[in-house]
Every structure is written in C-alpha cells, then in structure tokens.
C-alpha cells in the first residue's frame, strides 16, 4: 500500500512538473487597422478577406517595401525594392528626374526596360476594376494568381524587367535577417517567413497610401478658396463643351479623379502593343485602350501616358487640345475627336493646368508614415 502511494505521489509530481515547464502559447492578436475614409470618398474598400489590415502587418510591409533585399540578394549593386521605382516624392511613381532611370523609364536588375512606364501607387484601396495599364490583375480573374495587389508583389519580384528574383530565395533571405522573423510573428502569427506573407504585408502598406488633402480637397471642405483661374479650369474640366476631362478622370462626386476604366483616347492610328486592354478583354474596341490614371498629384509625376511619350503636363494638354488621332477604336466618350481635340485657347489651357495643380497633396508626398524607415530591423 505504501509503495502504491509513493508511486501515485511521484507520478503526480512528474505530471505537474511537466505542466509547469510547458511554455504557455502567446495568443496571436494583431492590432486591427481601420482606414479613416476621407470626406467625400467612397466607403467600399478593396481589401481581401484573407488579408485584413493590421498595424503590425503595415509596419512589416513598410520595411519590406523599402528594403532592397527584396531582390533576394545582398550585393550593393543587386539590391532592388518597390521603392526603387515607386518614389514617394513622385506620388510613388518613378518620375522624369529619377537618378537611375533617365526620363522616368525604369529598367530591372537585368537592364531590361519595363514594357510601360510606372503607374503611381495612390488610393489603390479603391481600385476594384483592375491593376496595371491593361488591368490584367482584377478581382474576378479566373486565374487566382492574377487578382490583387498581393499578386502584383509576386509578379514584380519575378519579372525579368523588374527585380528578376526568386520567391524561395527571397523568403529564405528574410528568414535569416535579424528582426524580421519576429515581425512576421507579430503580423501573421508565425516567425517562419513565407513569400505569401511578404505579399500580404507589402499589400497592406500599399493600401494605406491615401491622398486626400490637396488644395482642391480643402476647397471642397470649405477650408480655402480657389483662384479665379483655378475655378475656370475646374469648369473646363467638368464640362463636355470645355476640356471634357470628367468622363475618364471623374468630376464632381468622384474624388478619386479616375474611373479606373480603360479608354482609347486618340493617341495613335495603329495598334501593335501586345499589352493593351485588348490583350485582356478580347474586345476589338479595346485596341489601344489603357487605364485612365488618377490625376491626383499628377503634377509631380511623369512621363505621361502608358509609353511616357509626353514629358510635361503642358504637352498632355496640347495633345488633347488639337492632336487627337482618329481610328476605328476611339472611345465614344472622346466627343471632340472630329475636331482634332478640345481646341482650347492659351488662356484656357493655362486655367486647366492651374486647376490640375490644385490636386497636388504635399502632405501625402512628405508623410513620414509612408517614407523609408530610418533603419531596418537588423540595424536597430
């Protein structure tokens, strides 16, 4: 009997001792991040159900967006990140003054130039019709890997004319960099780095890149007044008999200043680009059609159009004024095509330009939350 009691007591001590030594799992509870929808902006946001916004995910995404080791390499001449081409001061576009890409025409680590110039990364959380000049990434794409910003990250890393990397190499590299595994654990509940979570983190950060505090925004909120020239330009912008910009770029009631749709806007008469909207839709009327980009911060971007043919906004306005090209595929909304353009006189062109410049948001262009971190996780 005494022996049995000793055995039971010993077994109890062993079991309770084991319980004390067993680590208690830390619950995975990332901090939800709710986008503060600006005045007058749409309430529908394009955020995938499998990638909810969190403070930790956005923080990690910001590091990854700017870290040149996203190339999967560590040699100084082989570093490339999202920010290499998407510069904050140029509304996350390359810009004509890019130090490494003369004229704003980017090329990848292989030296191969990108097929089209960069699009700005701005207010993309409201884009639900398709990403890229042709809209080849869209939510209901039958190809699951071609649907959203997350997929864009992967394609950018793999593209020969961009990072020219390998997803396995990239995720393995970040697994070895001090500080990153801990950030992945905080953001996604596991210190094991996966490329899928790299995609998710960067996409979360990109969805925070919201511009909503330009002079025009302040005017709409009743905080400032526009000059007479700017008001004249606004009237031109929003009227069919004026500059007729609003059909493609939105007018009153569309603070995004884009419809996110695709148009043949009369640039050419021959269409040989294998990456226009027709390549996606198969609709013959989409020959030579490309996304109407947002005009927010357009002043600091450029070059303009899908192929960067115009270096300045003045050139763009001149084109729409009297250089439109007739073709069988011209979009029906180009109502002034038979006149060769909208035929603006010099003062009207100046007024239109002055209005477009009111869409510049310097707060967005300098927001420290969007800027490169002072240091990366392994440098702290």
PLM regions with names:
Residues 143-187:
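A short, charged helix-loop
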Residues 23-146, 214-319, 324-331, 367-380:
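Short glycine/threonine-rich turn/loop motifs
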Residues 2-9:
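Sec-dependent signal peptide recognition
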Residues 15-18:
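C-terminal motif of bacterial Sec signal peptides marking the signal peptidase cleavage site
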Residues 57, 81, 145, 149, ...:
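Stable alpha-helical elements in mature extracytoplasmic
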Residues 171-182, 186, 190-212, 299, ...:
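C-terminal capping alpha-helices of c-type cytochrome domains
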Residues 42-46, 154-155, 163-168, 186, ...:
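Flexible glycine/proline-enriched surface loops and loop-helix/loop-strand junctions
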């Amino acid at each position: 009997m005494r022996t049995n009691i000793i055995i039971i007591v010993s077994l109890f001590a062993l079991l309770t001792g084991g319980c004390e030594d067993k680590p208690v799992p830390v619950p995975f509870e990332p901090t939800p991040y709710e986008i503060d929808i600006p005045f007058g902006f749409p309430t529908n946001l394009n955020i995938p159900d499998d990638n909810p916004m969190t403070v930790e995910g956005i923080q990690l995404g910001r590091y990854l967006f700017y870290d040149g080791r996203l190339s999967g390499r560590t040699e100084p001449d082989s570093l490339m990140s999202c920010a290499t081409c998407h510069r904050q001061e140029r509304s996350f576009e390359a810009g004509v003054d890019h130090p490494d890409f003369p004229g704003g025409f980017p090329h990848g680590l292989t030296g191969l130039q990108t097929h089209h110039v960069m699009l700005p990364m701005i207010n993309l959380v409201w884009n639900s019709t398709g990403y890229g000049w042709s809209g080849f990434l869209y939510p209901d794409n039958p190809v699951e890997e071609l649907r959203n910003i997350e997929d864009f990250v992967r394609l950018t890393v793999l593209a020969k004319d961009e990072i020219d990397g390998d997803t396995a190499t990239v995720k393995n590299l970040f697994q070895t960099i001090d500080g990153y595994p801990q950030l992945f654990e905080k953001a996604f509940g596991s210190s094991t780095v996966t490329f899928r979570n790299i995609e998710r983190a960067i996409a979360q950060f990109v969805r925070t890149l919201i511009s909503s505090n330009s002079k025009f925004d302040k005017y709409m909120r009743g905080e400032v007044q526009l000059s007479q020239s700017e008001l004249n330009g606004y009237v031109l912008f929003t009227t069919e008999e004026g500059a007729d910009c609003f059909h493609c770029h939105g007018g009153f009631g569309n603070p995004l200043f884009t419809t996110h749709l695709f148009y043949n806007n009369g640039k050419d008469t021959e269409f040989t680009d294998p990456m226009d909207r027709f390549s996606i839709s198969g609709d013959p009327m989409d020959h030579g059609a490309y996304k109407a980009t947002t005009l927010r911060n357009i002043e600091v971007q450029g070059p303009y159009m899908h192929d960067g043919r115009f270096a300045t906004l003045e050139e763009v306005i001149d084109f729409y004024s009297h250089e439109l090209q007739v073709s069988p595929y011209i979009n029906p909304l180009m109502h002034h095509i038979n006149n060769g353009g909208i035929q603006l006189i010099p003062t009207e062109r100046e007024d239109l330009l002055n209005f477009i410049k009111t869409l510049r948001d310097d707060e967005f262009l300098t927001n420290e939350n969007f800027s490169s971190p002072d240091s990366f996780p392994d440098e702290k």
